[in-house]
A protein has these predicted regions:
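Alpha-helical segment of the N-proximal tetratricopeptide repeat
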Residues: 2-29, 45-54
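TPR-repeat structural position
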Residues: 17, 50-52, 59, 93, ...
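Alpha-helical linker/edge segments of TPR/alpha-solenoid repeat scaffolds
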Residues: 46-55, 91-95, 120-143
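Structural marker of alpha-solenoid helical repeat scaffolds
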Residues: 29-30, 72, 106
Length: 172
């Protein structure tokens, strides 16, 4: 496992994200370690070009690889940064912010993380809409649809109505 991760690091330094993706996607998902999924997500994040139609798909793939490992990587700088990065470039600054703040907590003073936090706060207070209203609405509806079952379960389980803040945080 360490050999493949070392090789991925080398490819990353050489900007060979496709090699990382090919190598790690060749390993069945159930055999990949959380670290491998994190490296694969990093490669998808780095390949996501905002000027290409595949951008959102790449970022969503990265999130799908990272999300299952939330408990495992809870206090990991890279995992939190990668989650924030994916959400940020999916124009979900509200969601991105909490991951960048956690990353900064783990690595205080990190300039890249501080820069993203500022950009998130600016995006939240002064949103710049690069897409038309219809596209933004469709994207948010798609995001909501993906999360609806999880949200409904949270509401159903919240018999004493104490998880409101948690529900709101999930939708930011």
């Amino acid at each position: 496992d360490m050999d493949i991760l070392k090789q991925c690091q080398k490819w990353h330094e050489e900007s060979k994200q496709h090699k990382i993706i090919d190598a790690l996607e060749a390993i069945p998902a159930e055999e990949r370690t959380p670290e491998m999924d994190s490296e694969l997500a990093r490669a998808y994040n780095n390949l996501a070009d905002p000027h290409k139609p595949t951008c959102k798909e790449m970022l969503k793939k990265a999130l799908a690889l990272l999300k299952p490992h939330e408990e495992y990587f809870e206090d990991d700088y890279y995992w939190n940064f990668r989650m924030g990065y994916s959400y940020f470039y999916l124009d979900q600054e509200g969601r991105a912010l909490r991951y960048f703040e956690k990353a900064l907590e783990v690595r205080p003073g990190d300039d890249d993380t501080k820069e993203f936090i500022e950009r998130c706060k600016k995006g939240i207070s002064l949103p710049q809409f690069w897409e038309c209203f219809r596209e933004r609405t469709e994207d948010w509806w798609e995001t909501f649809a993906e999360m609806e079952a999880e949200l409904r379960q949270m509401m159903d389980e919240d018999k004493d109505h104490t998880r409101g803040a948690e529900l709101v945080a999930q939708m930011q």
